[in-house]
């Protein structure tokens, strides 16, 4: 998993509440078990019309935001079903950070497992960031995981809380497999001891 330390990039404003996982990646794209290739279908029903043409008004179809790496969204982002394809699609598009007043619990935890930093901030601070994001490509936000801060293009700084274990996993690029591999020596030692103690197993 890619490490996350500091990110300076374009933030796309998505001022919608209750953005559920079906909006993030519709059910027809859930057949794959690959984590790559889903970015083109991120927010599919909002990005494309029935003929597959881009809807110009949608934020990620606008030239200023096509290379966005941050999303600033409304309350309860990632609600709905627990599909892990949602963070897969977000990551595959190029988004590494989502900022919102709140997140659905399962989506929130899935983000960390896929190298995405979800940041929960008070509504009034999200409103400031939303306005900053609306400035377009010339306005770049900086997210510093080490200091747990978000800095606007105007230099305004907001601090966020984060579980130390989740922070470590992101900064070191550790997913579930990586965490297991950290303990591989202890696992091997246990298995050898268990085999000697119970050779009949």
Swiss-Prot record:
SUPFAM superfamilies: LeuD/IlvD-like
Catalytic class of the enzyme: lyase
Stretches of the chain forming a coiled coil according to its record: none
A GO MF term: 3-isopropylmalate dehydratase activity
Record-listed E.C. numbers: 4.2.1.33
Transmembrane segments: none
InterPro entries per record: 3-IsopropMal_deHydase_ssu (IPR004431), Aconitase/3IPM_dehydase_swvl (IPR015928), AconitaseA/IPMdHydase_ssu_swvl (IPR000573), IPMI_Swivel (IPR033940), LeuD (IPR050075)
Short name of any one Pfam family annotated for the protein: Aconitase_C
Domain of life per record: Bacteria
Reaction(s) this enzyme catalyzes, per UniProt: (2R,3S)-3-isopropylmalate = (2S)-2-isopropylmalate
Keywords: Amino-acid biosynthesis, Branched-chain amino acid biosynthesis, Leucine biosynthesis, Lyase
Pathway as given in its UniProt record: Amino-acid biosynthesis; L-leucine biosynthesis; L-leucine from 3-methyl-2-oxobutanoate: step 2/4
CDD domains: IPMI_Swivel
GO cellular-component term (any): 3-isopropylmalate dehydratase complex
GO biological process assignments: L-leucine biosynthetic process
PANTHER family tied to this protein: 3-ISOPROPYLMALATE DEHYDRATASE SMALL SUBUNIT, 3-ISOPROPYLMALATE DEHYDRATASE SMALL SUBUNIT 2-RELATED-RELATED
Role according to the record: Catalyzes the isomerization between 2-isopropylmalate and 3-isopropylmalate, via the formation of 2-isopropylmaleate.
HAMAP family, per database record: LeuD_type1 (MF_01031)
Similarity comment: Belongs to the LeuD family. LeuD type 1 subfamily.
Subunit composition and interactions: Heterodimer of LeuC and LeuD.
Name this protein carries in UniProt: 3-isopropylmalate dehydratase small subunit
Gene coding for it: leuD
